Amino acid sequence: GGSCGQCKVHVKSGGGDILPTELGHISKGEAREGCRLSCQVNVKTNMEIELEDEIFGVKKWECTVISNDNKATFIKELKLQIPDGDSVPFRAGGYIQIEAPAHHVKYADYDIPAEYRGDWDHFGFFKLESKVDEETIRAYSMANYPEEEGIIMLNVRIASPPPRDLSLPCGKMSSYIFSLNAGDKVTISGPFGEFFAKDTDNEMVFVGGGAGMAPMRSHIFDQLKRLHTSRKMSFWYGARSKREMFYVEDFDGLAAENENFDWHVALSDPQPEDNWEGKTGFIHNVLYESYLRDHEAPEDCEY
């Protein structure tokens, strides 16, 4: 507990002193106003607390897996169907929590396309197993945007142990998610979130890499397809090689349709077969060197 910082509440009375485990997520100003992490507050006497209105809109759904496809070597796009007649009233940039039961998963049973299996074999991942004897809950940002109704779409990277020590435990939730197939049932709850766009006219700069694509896609699609914003927007995405790039056609299409939007990719480890002539290196460095360094007012952008 105390690691994600997502369970903030305002304690009006009771609850004792704030704990060291909370201080990494709560500023001094927030602490003075009674902000606490609910998972760290021991209830020993009567307390008075204040919750955000959004908390009361949280629900639980049993969803059906529509598809669970690799979008990159170690990233799957999990698409879930919400029960008929229902919807998740989320905002772009929000997230859900997904539940995994106790399970024993063998990586050898995963459905990994041929184009990606070489790396899985190389690192010895097909020898791995994940054994979990208790329910697990984890949070994932949604990759879809609100007008993509009736579904939840997640980008999930497998949390394998480092290749140099495969004896370390596998990621409990990602190992479970990679084992899911069309038709399987999955329980989620939500919506949650604080990573929402501000309603201003300021320029928007989106930066992400790997499975960090999810909230970027949600925000950018929402701004351009639902809100039809005229705000200047750019998306800077980092990947290892061309094989690790995904949603390329989607973003190319958005850039062609919206003159206020452009997107850029930098590869940190382009392969010879990529014939890559674009930007290389880590995306945050590329963003600074090729754009923000000469930007007239980078402090006015929203990131």
Curated annotation (Swiss-Prot):
This entry's comment on the bound cofactor is: Binds 1 [2Fe-2S] cluster.
Task: Tell me which residues make up the 2Fe-2S ferredoxin-type domain.
Answer: 1-45
Domain FAD-binding FR-type as annotated: residue spans: 58-198
| Compartments where located | Cell inner membrane
Which terms does the UniProt entry file under GO BP?
A: sodium ion transport
Catalytic: annotated span: 201-303
Enzymatic reactions: a ubiquinone + n Na(+)(in) + NADH + H(+) = a ubiquinol + n Na(+)(out) + NAD(+)
Q: Which Gene3D superfamilies match?
A: 3.10.20.30, Nucleotide-binding domain of ferredoxin-NADP reductase (FNR) module (3.40.50.80), Translation factors (2.40.30.10)
Question: What keywords were assigned to this record?
Answer: 2Fe-2S, Cell inner membrane, Cell membrane, FAD, Flavoprotein, Ion transport, Iron, Iron-sulfur, Membrane, Metal-binding, NAD, Sodium, Sodium transport, Translocase, Transport, Ubiquinone
Query: What does it do?
Result: NQR complex catalyzes the reduction of ubiquinone-1 to ubiquinol by two successive reactions, coupled with the transport of Na(+) ions from the cytoplasm to the periplasm. The first step is catalyzed by NqrF, which accepts electrons from NADH and reduces ubiquinone-1 to ubisemiquinone by a one-electron transfer pathway.
PANTHER family per the record? NA(+)-TRANSLOCATING NADH-QUINONE REDUCTASE SUBUNIT, NAD(P)H-FLAVIN REDUCTASE
Name of the protein this chain belongs to? Na(+)-translocating NADH-quinone reductase subunit F
Source species: Shewanella hanedai (Alteromonas hanedai)
